[in-house]
Amino acid sequence: MRLDGKVALITGSTRGIGRTMAEMFAAEGAKVVLSGRSVDKGEKNVERIRGAGGEAMFLPIDVTSEDSVRDGVAAAIDAYGPITTLINNAAPTALVNVSFKPLHELTLQEWDDIVRGSVTSAFLMTKYTVPHMLQAGGGSIVNISSGAAVFGVPGLGPYSAGKGGMNSLTRVIAADYGRQGVRCNTIIVGRVVSYAADRGPDTTKEFLRVGNPKDIGYAALWLAADESEWITGSEITADGGARYNASEI
């Protein structure tokens, strides 16, 4: 199997894309650490993975809290050993509670909460995971970004800015740690049938079709596997061609 011997920590894996990635990674032989806000959903996902013969555990990591991230990463390593794959997939909690607003209607707190949940969370997860990857001789970090970082989506200012920051963070991580065997890449996700995407306005026109979580899972699998060992600092756009139909957006 493609991920035998690997340990993957996937944030935001209680539903949608994250849950699907966790199932796909486990099916390819990885030990998977799921994390998210819902303990009940997380534990049910672990049961499903174990029922299919995979190995998994759940940790309720708050990716916006440095203490929670530090303790969660330590707990994952205590259970499974060094993390070889980090998937920064968690979406900002505040995005669920904030209606789509133009910039002048946002409070500073709303802005800060969404940006913190987008890019600061990826920084914190990387900060506490990378040292163990370096000790183990390398690893792969995959940042799950959004087409909102590329296009100016009305009402999604802080989310677009946060995900744009994540794209830049990918390049910094690749530059900082590439010579030490740690790779970092971004998947820019278009419209996918999931909880988060279903809340947004219909602003895209895909050449192919609306995506599903497995479309993103396949890209993440490749970036986590050794077959992509020469790829770092790159962006993979998985949006059904919507980027090239921008005149219709």
Regions found by a protein language model. Name each.
Residues 84, 104-123, 138, 142, ...:
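Catalytic Tyr-X3-Lys loop
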Residues 39, 61-72, 108, 214-215:
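The beta1-alpha1 cofactor-binding region of Rossmann-like NAD(H)/NADP(H)-dependent oxidoreductases
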Residues 179, 186-187, 201-231, 236-240:
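C-terminal helical subdomain
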Residues 126, 162, 170:
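Active-site helix of classical SDR
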Residues 151, 232-249:
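Short C-terminal tail/terminal secondary-structure segment
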Residues 131, 175-176, 229:
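Alpha-helical segment proximal to the catalytic Tyr-Lys
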Residues 146:
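Residue(s) in the substrate-gating loop at a strand-loop-helix junction
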Residues 7, 14-15, 38:
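Conserved glycine-rich cofactor-binding loop
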